[in-house]
A protein has these predicted regions:
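Membrane-anchoring alpha-helices and their flanking helix-loop junctions
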Residues: 1-134, 163-217
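Active-site-proximal inter-transmembrane loops
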Residues: 134-156
Length: 217
């Protein structure tokens, strides 16, 4: 009887951790961000807040292009799917926010967006070349905001989502925001499950207890 041959996980891992393969994946992954950034800065109605918010996307693109090649990458296809939906869901989310209505003075969400951008820029600069969308071991980062929470980029993202709800409220905006928060929280847990096989990250988890908000969660 013939047997079905399955792919060798170690060979596939070796393939994914090849520098040129990782670089190619990174370039493909940031393509939607590049397109979004182009439309953002060519928009005749570009505001100061949206212009500043684009800075963190620029940092994302640069660090992804020059990111460190991982020593391990998850081979779980569900984790890759989650990373895809959570990452690009945020980009898609902004397309729906203009359909809502503000429920507070515009200065409030504008201030929150600037706060979220500051958090994410600080976190992205601190993370540096260890960035990635799917769970991968690119070196453990403990500097900057990572001294206080384990997922500061997501923390900034949560603040931004809350700001957009206040600025462009609608049932759809609220529903999408809640779904995205849930996906990012799940992504955080999955990333930690993968990384804690590294003793250095396991020790980091005991030192920094909170995932998103110091002293809270």
């Amino acid at each position: 009887m013939a047997t079905v041959q399955t792919a060798n996980p170690s060979r596939f891992m070796e393939f994914l951790t090849t520098p040129w393969v990782d670089k190619t994946i990174a370039i493909v992954a940031i393509t939607p961000n590049v397109v979004e950034l182009y439309h953002r800065y060519t928009d005749a109605n570009l505001t100061f807040v949206r212009g500043v918010a684009g800075i963190q996307t620029i940092i994302l693109i640069i660090t992804m292009v020059f990111r460190r090649t991982p020593v391990r990458v998850t081979l779980n296809p569900w984790y890759w799917l989650l990373a895809f939906v959570a990452t690009y869901g945020i980009v898609a989310f902004y397309a729906f926010t203009a359909r809502g209505r503000p429920i507070v003075p515009i200065i409030v969400p504008s201030a929150l967006v600037l706060i979220s951008v500051a958090i994410m820029i600080y976190a992205r600069v601190s993370l540096g070349r260890s960035i990635g969308f799917v769970p991968a071991d690119r070196g453990i980062v403990t500097r900057g905001p990572y001294k206080f929470v384990r997922h500061p980029i997501y923390s900034g993202g949560f603040v931004a989502l809350f700001a957009f709800i206040l600025r462009s409220y609608s049932p759809l905006t609220l529903l999408l925001a809640v779904i995205l928060v849930g996906l990012l929280m799940l992504k955080s847990v999955i990333e930690e499950h993968f990384l804690r096989d590294n003793p250095e990250y396991a020790a980091y988890m005991t030192q920094v207890r909170y995932r998103w908000v110091p002293g809270v969660a």
